[in-house]
């Protein structure tokens, strides 16, 4: 039983490191891919519905 634990722990450790490295690489790719225009569009998409709801609440629509 003990002889199986070491390889399994090593495998788990290596898989965890590999997963972490892949996640960091993916985040770096997403940051490179995001352009300022795309970020502004995302902010506008989130901002416009809020403004619409606010105005409809004020004018009693």
UniProtKB/Swiss-Prot annotation:
Cellular compartment(s): Secreted
One cellular component (GO) term of this entry: extracellular region
Q: Name one GO biological process term.
A: killing of cells of another organism
Top-level taxon: Eukaryota
- Signal peptide residues are 1-22
Listed transmembrane segments: none
Alphabetical keyword list = Amphibian defense peptide, Antibiotic, Antimicrobial, Cleavage on pair of basic residues, Cytolysis, Fungicide, Hemolysis, Secreted, Signal
Q: Which residues form the propeptide?
A: 23-44
Primary residence: secreted
Parts forming coiled coils: none
What does the entry state regarding organ or tissue expression? Expressed by the skin glands.
Q: Which InterPro entries match?
A: Frog_antimicrobial_propeptide
Q: What does this protein do?
A: Antimicrobial peptide active against a variety of Gram-positive bacterial strains but not against Gram-negative bacteria. Has weak antifungal activity against a slime mold isolate. Has weak hemolytic activity against human erythrocytes.
Q: Of which family is this protein a member?
A: Belongs to the frog skin active peptide (FSAP) family. Temporin subfamily.
Q: What is this protein called?
A: Temporin-CG3
Name its species.
Amolops chunganensis (Chungan torrent frog)
């Amino acid at each position: 039983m003990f002889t199986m634990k070491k390889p399994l722990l090593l495998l788990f450790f290596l898989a965890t490191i590999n997963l972490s490295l892949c996640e960091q690489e993916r985040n770096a790719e997403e940051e490179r891919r995001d352009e300022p225009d795309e970020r502004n569009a995302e902010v506008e998409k989130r901002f416009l519905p809020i403004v619409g709801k606010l105005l409809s609440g004020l004018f009693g629509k």
